[in-house]
Amino acid sequence: MRNEEAEKLFWIFNNKVRPINYSEIVENTTPRKSSINREKIESENNGQVYNELFFFKLLLNEDLSKFLISLINTNLRHEREKKLDKGKDISRLNDLTDITFWKFITDYLKNIYSNKNNDKIPPELINLKMMDHNRYSAVHNVLDMKSHRFEEYCEIFMNSALKYINIGNVLNCDETIYAYYGKDAIKDHILINNDSKPHSVGIEAYSLTTKLNISNCPYVISYGPRTPENCQSPFNSLKTLLDNLHSKYNWEDPRNNLIVCCDSAFALVNNKECLDELKCRILSSTRKSGVTVPQEIKIFVKPLLTIHKTFLFYDESTGLLYEYTKNTAGHINCIATNLYSRYSNPYVEINNNLNIEQFATIGNLFRFSKKELELIFVGETLHGTTLEILNGKYKTNFVKPPCGPFWNEQMLKKLSAEHIAQIYNDKYKKENNNLNKNDKIKKILEPLDSTQDGGIYDKNKNYSKKELQDLKIKVIGTHQNRSQMIHDQYIFWYNLVDITDKRYYATIRGSSSHSYTKLFILGGLFDLILNSYSLHREYHEMELECKNPENQPPEIIQTINKFVESLIFQFHELKELQ
């Protein structure tokens, strides 16, 4: 530690301010700043290539490539038979070979990227003539791998990978939207619209994700599509994800070691029994506006901050957490946040009549001592997922409530008519000058249609039990008959969540996913590429971290080849059982 930092920390202790030891709640890791958007991979044999395609080829050995090609060729054969019966040309529906398969994959990657100015085709494909438009379209249209074998392979991929990586104990729960514009989903009111997502219109899903400890790449642990409910869907979806997680990993006492960071919508349940069922601790947050920033702390932290560090100051008297960050221009920004944690602890008494923010402060989670001031100095020891929640998430938005996800009548009546009009127009996506201020307030307080509200309400439209069951079957399918189900296009591991889509998925054109078939292409091929990239990046970073081979822990000496070999072995076992 530099002398300047030591002197500052000495000042902290002398002034009764205590740094918080994060090892009490999270693993002590050293996340690195890494970008998975457009980074190039240097290799003697590959030069500069699409890094995703390079890792995808590492994952797909000859057997797996043949398997994927066979699925495509089966669909091409069915299409040829249809065309032959009608006497039409079938030349563009000929079977794919290994070379033409990689031609198609390369063309596909080129077409879905929104910015490809700096990309180069892999050397082994440079001299190959790419597919003509008709041939490419024909393959693109039949690439519908709704095979149970393919879905089971995806499950093997996830389970095998988790044997070699440490997922940590801090997870992030968030929603994402999978682009889809089908009329069937519109008719059933399953589609939602959220302009903040890379693809604003589509079907919503919830996921639990973490970051790989060394490479800092995102990796999704559990996934579930959103289903219509007569209650708040985010909380129920979170409970389902956690139940699946506990059954898979069988933690002895998960309440002591599992922390889930999420938006406030996932924690707004005034019911002690519901919280007990979660079997974890929930760290959630709401933005607090209109507060005075402690200028003396701002001056104090300025020499301590670097661009990639965050300084958190908790004032117990106000219950606010002040987050100081330094931007690239060197200016110090501060955001005041009301943080609270939710325990699934039977010994914690919860009064259902209290406001949500009065249940438990962040002090319960971080075990603050009873002092006037408390300080959290966040360097590089905080888990990356927690940083994702605490750093840069709370942006000023005048159409959103200053605290919590819901407006109430008392808040709205204090606002001007122009401000009310902005909130009304944002909610209903249209202007209505015929309504006065009070009428607009009433409309703002009304919940939207239960399945088109962006995930906040799911209790306005009172579905019968049969209607709910029919809609759930349409979304997640059944084991007996899944050929017509949306779940065929949303296998569980299609898992790009908010932590990922802002960094990676935004580079993909939304027009590449305008049907179930093309949506499944993104879910199948592109996520295989993303997951294999994250895992291989993790292994590469592991090798750099472990300079002394004698001190390498068992999970680190597992090489990429061993991982792929185990994956292939299990896949062959699965095929033999069918």
UniProtKB/Swiss-Prot annotation:
GO terms for cellular component: vesicle. One of its GO terms (biological process) is positive regulation of aggregate size involved in sorocarp development. It comes from the Eukaryota. Involved in regulation of group size of aggregation streams. This is Suppressor of smlA. It comes from Dictyostelium discoideum (Social amoeba).
